């Protein structure tokens, strides 16, 4: 199976394989088969639109985890100039599962922070599969407080299965680090915009997700636990993950309807990994619009708005 396609995309993968075969035949034999290729491309587009127009919550969860999906550093490359990565929490270590630093968005200085998964095996291990340890969250907190001092807006990119649950992380105060970030972010005197670009897993996501404006990409997820974890608790088997995903309401549109998400950013047909540059431009437009709005608020109004937003969660 083509690793660029998920199970439910197999019919699309089959059509793409036929198109590639025809291209090779045409190149080898100098045959003009452009009409047939064009017909198959139209068929592939229509099939993709049909499949992606009827995705289940579980299928969206799979897309959010797609190995080719753009990560934080990919978007930093597309969106920002003069990015200077900053390291270390000044307490214990540097955590590669969270990246952050100063950059410019259309010439204006910003602080960028986000989870970072890995592509290859070694990088995945080095970045702990995007699951931060306490030092990652403390690094993020240090950078956010720096942004406040220098009056820079904070832009965060969320993409994690969750905070690392290992013994070493617990020994170094994982829950305290997350809780401290929530406290600090609620009070920071600078605009904060968070964007969920893949998985938004529980407290590991929320620790850089307290904000004035929350965006989610169309095929991202945000939840208190993974569908597999929920299924294992409720049904005693991870095989019930599709049912759990539906019941939990983890998708961008569901969360927008609940008032948790402010903006759902549409993805290119087939997902962000099909056209990362186009996806980045859509994100750029939203960030610039939202920054202009937030920077136009008085500081007291900004903080009151943020507080009211937090207090509204879970209210009838």
From Swiss-Prot:
The record, for InterPro entries, names: Acetyl_CoA_COase_a_su, ClpP/crotonase-like_dom_sf, COA_CT_C
Q: In which pathway does it act?
A: Lipid metabolism; malonyl-CoA biosynthesis; malonyl-CoA from acetyl-CoA: step 1/1
What cellular component terms from Gene Ontology apply here? acetyl-CoA carboxylase complex
Task: Identify the domain of life.
Answer: Bacteria
Q: Where in the cell is it found?
A: Cytoplasm
- Domain CoA carboxyltransferase C-terminal positions: 39-293
* A molecular-function term among this protein's GO annotations: ATP binding
**Which BP terms from GO are recorded?**
fatty acid biosynthetic process; malonyl-CoA biosynthetic process
Q: How does it assemble?
A: Acetyl-CoA carboxylase is a heterohexamer composed of biotin carboxyl carrier protein (AccB), biotin carboxylase (AccC) and two subunits each of ACCase subunit alpha (AccA) and ACCase subunit beta (AccD).
Family the UniProt entry places it in: Belongs to the AccA family.
> What is the name attached to this protein's record?
Acetyl-coenzyme A carboxylase carboxyl transferase subunit alpha
Q: Which gene encodes it?
A: accA
């Amino acid at each position: 199976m083509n690793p660029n396609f998920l199970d439910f995309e197999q019919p699309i993968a089959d059509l793409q394989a036929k198109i590639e075969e025809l291209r090779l035949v045409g190149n080898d034999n100098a045959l003009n088969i452009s009409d047939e290729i064009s017909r198959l491309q139209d068929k592939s587009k229509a099939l993709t639109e049909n499949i992606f127009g009827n995705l289940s919550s579980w299928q969206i969860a799979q897309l959010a985890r797609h190995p080719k999906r753009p990560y934080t550093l990919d978007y930093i490359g597309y969106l920002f100039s003069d990015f200077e990565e900053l390291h270390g929490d000044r307490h214990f270590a540097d955590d590669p599962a969270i990246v952050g630093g100063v950059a410019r968005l259309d010439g204006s200085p910003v602080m960028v922070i986000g989870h970072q998964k890995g592509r290859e095996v070694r990088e995945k291990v080095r970045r702990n599969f995007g699951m931060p340890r306490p030092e990652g969250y403390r690094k993020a907190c240090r950078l956010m407080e720096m942004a406040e001092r220098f009056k820079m807006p904070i832009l965060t990119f969320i993409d994690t299965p969750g905070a690392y649950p290992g013994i070493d992380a617990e020994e170094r105060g994982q829950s305290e680090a997350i809780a401290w970030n929530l406290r600090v972010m609620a009070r920071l005197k600078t605009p904060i915009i968070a964007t969920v670009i893949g998985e938004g897993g529980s407290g590991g996501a929320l620790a850089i997700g307290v904000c004035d404006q929350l965006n989610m990409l169309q095929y991202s997820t945000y939840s208190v636990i993974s569908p597999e974890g929920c299924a294992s608790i409720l049904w005693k088997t991870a095989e019930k993950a599709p049912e759990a995903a539906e019941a939990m309401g983890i998708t961008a549109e569901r969360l927008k309807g609940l008032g948790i998400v402010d903006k759902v950013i549409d993805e290119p047909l087939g997902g962000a990994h099909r056209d990362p540059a186009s996806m980045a431009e859509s994100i750029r437009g939203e960030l610039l619009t939202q920054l202009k709005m937030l920077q136009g608020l008085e500081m007291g109004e900004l903080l009151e708005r943020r507080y009211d937003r937090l207090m509204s969660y879970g209210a009838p």
